[in-house]
């Protein structure tokens, strides 16, 4: 798959906050361009008029050959409390991610414009969701991200029932491995992703890996 020159500045031109550019809108063309060149949008919220496009100096990644499930969560998975589906309710997942309460954040970056753009990106086959459902068939948790060939860029996750988002994460990794994916871009490293083996690497190293493994989006 050939890649045209990006419409964005190079990630190595990011400022001290990891921002490479700002725009007043977000389109599928911009999303396709940014992910395949190591950049992602991170809006401040509905009240701001510009959308920052970011390439952090340090990047959170999960190399799938280093993935492991903590023993405590292995025991939780054996309870079989959830079932997993893929792409069964993408819009519901991204809206739930937007509504999730995050104590360490002042609000959600998933604005209505972001939801609209990613739902369209999903219809184009780039954005995918992994969902967990409880025994009653209710959506209990999930996550979504972008397929860039053998790289998968995770975006956001949520849970309504404890453990549901981690269950979705594990099922996502199992699915990605089956399709030959090498790494998940987690952007940042959280306690949850660190427990599965995520780590930080310099932006330049991430870009090198991305160029090596990026390709046509996968179909699940």
Please tell me what each predicted stretch does.
Residues 1-220:
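N-acyltransferase acceptor-side catalytic subdomain
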């Amino acid at each position: 798959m050939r890649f045209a020159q990006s419409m964005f500045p190079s990630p190595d031109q990011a400022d001290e906050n990891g921002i490479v550019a700002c725009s007043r809108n977000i389109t599928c063309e911009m999303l396709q361009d940014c992910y395949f060149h190591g950049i992602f949008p991170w809006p401040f919220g509905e009240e701001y008029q510009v959308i920052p496009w970011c390439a952090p100096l340090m990047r959170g990644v999960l190399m799938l050959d280093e993935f492991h499930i903590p023993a405590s969560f292995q025991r939780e998975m054996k309870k079989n409390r959830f079932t997993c589906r893929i792409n069964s309710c993408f819009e519901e997942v991204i809206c739930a991610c937007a509504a999730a309460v995050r104590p360490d954040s002042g609000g959600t970056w998933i604005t209505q414009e972001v939801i609209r753009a990613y739902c369209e990106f999903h219809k184009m086959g780039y954005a995918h969701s992994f969902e967990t459902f409880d025994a009653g068939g209710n959506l209990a948790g999930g996550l979504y991200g972008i397929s860039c060939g053998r790289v998968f860029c995770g975006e956001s996750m949520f849970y309504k029932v404890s453990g549901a988002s981690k269950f979705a994460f594990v099922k996502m990794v199992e699915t990605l491995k089956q399709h030959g994916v090498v790494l998940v871009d987690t952007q940042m490293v959280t306690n949850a992703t660190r427990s599965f083996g995520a780590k930080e690497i310099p932006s330049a190293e991430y870009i090198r890996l991305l160029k090596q493994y990026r390709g046509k989006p996968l179909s699940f």
